Amino acid sequence: GFAAAGWPVRVATDAPCANAVAAALRGAGAAPAVGLDIVAGEGDVAASIAAVAAGWRAAGITHAIAIERCGRAADGAPYNMRGISVAGVTAPLDDLFTGGPWTRIGIGDGGNEVGMGKLPAALIAASVPNGAKIACVTPADHLVVCGVSNWGAYGLLTAMAALRPDLAPALRSTLTGAADRRILDTLVRDGPAGDPVAGARAASVDGYPHEVHAEVIARLDAALSS
């Protein structure tokens, strides 16, 4: 994707998610070229975030993209879609998202993700279960709302490939059904990670089997080629 296009890329997560994100990077063939920044889950979290932000500035990062990242609600806590606080296992990466000069892009599907503060809270409250409680208040400069967050990420890559045809082969290098399956299988096997919607450690995302996601990729590819 972006790294193959020659742009500086860093991936940030918190300690509870670090193993899973590292596995996804390996599955994508992005490790070790794409560095992984891990924000502490306890202790001086603010200092940990500040250190990562300083590293991003030094690396020349210009855009921060939050994908399916649970963010702060109005009461300051992050919530899952069931309205349960996940503050104990979720570092406030909102502060990294907003803590530098980068353009901020949020991608989400449930209203509780970083960037959803771009939308009126009343809209989220009226649109999803527990919306009034879980709506994230952290805004983005640009927001992509989608049925599944992965699809929004696919769409962003496809749109950039359309805008930069000279970089399209690089941007689309991991945007194939086979590559997506490899990432998912590595994530499930080595993360280990599962699908909370399916309630199982399975190669599915938000309850949809891989074949559904591969079809979305194929449709985006067809749209780009038409």
Regions found by a protein language model. Name each.
Residues 14-15, 39-42, 67-70, 107-110, ...:
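Fold-independent oxyanion-binding glycine-rich loops
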Residues 111-226:
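C-terminal functional extensions of proteins
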Residues 10, 37, 63, 103-107:
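Hydrophobic/aromatic beta-strand patches that form the interior of the parallel beta-sheet core
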Residues 21-97:
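An acidic, phosphate/nucleotide-engaging active-site surface
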Residues 3:
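Gly/Ala-rich phosphate-binding loop of Rossmann-like dinucleotide-binding domains
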Residues 17-22, 114-115:
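Short, charged/polar "capping" segments at the starts of alpha-helices
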Residues 6-16:
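Short internal beta-strands
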Residues 91-123:
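Catalytic cores of nucleophile-dependent amide-cleaving enzymes
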